[in-house]
Amino acid sequence: MNGWAGVCLITHCLNTRSRTYVALNMLAFARTPRGVPSCLFNKVWVSRYALVLILMVCASESSTSWAVTSNGLPNCSTVTRTAGQDAELHGPAPLSCNVTQWGRYENGSTPVLWCTLRGSRMRVSLGHRVAFGCSWKTFFIYNVSESSGGTYYQKGYNCTDKHITLSCFNLTVVPRAVQSTTTVMTPTLVTNSTFSVSLVALRLTTNSSAFGHAIYQRQQRVENGTLSKNITNLAFTYGSWGVAMLLFAAVMVLVDLGLPQSAWRRWRSHVDDEERGLLM
């Protein structure tokens, strides 16, 4: 059993298309040998539970372990934004891809995954301290700063035209113009023949404190909305796998204890008794 299950587990880790098929193969070959008592906590069942748990954990992980390096990248598109603006990176990956990933190259060559889309589900990596969003064709970065600049990539897997598609974007963030303030001393004549001097501040800028406060509130709303959406997606993904593992474990326990077989035998015995009663 352990040999077949190990082969199936290795096949699962190498195969990124169909995990359900591998799970069925493992369950088909993982049977209790003859002469071994069917017990919930014997060595065979303990090893079986361990392999199934490993399989579930591997299945919950998407194909994010595929290495992406900056070597051999296509010609990257250049995107320039001023600090404080929003940036949109439009990728050419078609909707025919089963999986789409967005990320950024750190330190020039190390890929860091930010977002993964698989079907109707989205998985977002937290901790980047950047308000962003992603879709199948567009990656959004809100209120960019100088630290937001760099090389971003989009990768599609299992596409109809080719197995893997890759595109990259060089985001350049230009700092804002330096705001200057000029103070002019102007005399003011009062009607009671007294002379006083007042300061008149002439600000050579169009930005006001109210406008800056509105931008800050908008940024906070975007970050809070993105964070709540990411938490909801993570809770749904891991909650679904938790429910599936509990149901699967319950079915395995019932089968191992022989409850379905016992219920079937009792029902057949009851039917046979009724048939014999009718014949008599």
Swiss-Prot record:
Major location (coarse): host cell
Keyword annotations from UniProtKB, A to Z: Glycoprotein, Host membrane, Membrane, Transmembrane, Transmembrane helix
Domain of life assignment: Viruses
Cystine residue pairs: none
Subcellular location: Host membrane
Glycosylation sites: N75, N98, N107, N143, N158, N170, N192, N207, N224, N230
Organism: Human cytomegalovirus (strain Merlin)
Coiled coil ranges: none
Family: Belongs to the RL11 family.
Name of this protein: Uncharacterized protein UL6
Membrane topology label: Single-pass membrane protein
Keyword Glycoprotein: yes
Transmembrane segments: 235-255
Any GO CC annotation of this UniProt entry: host cell membrane
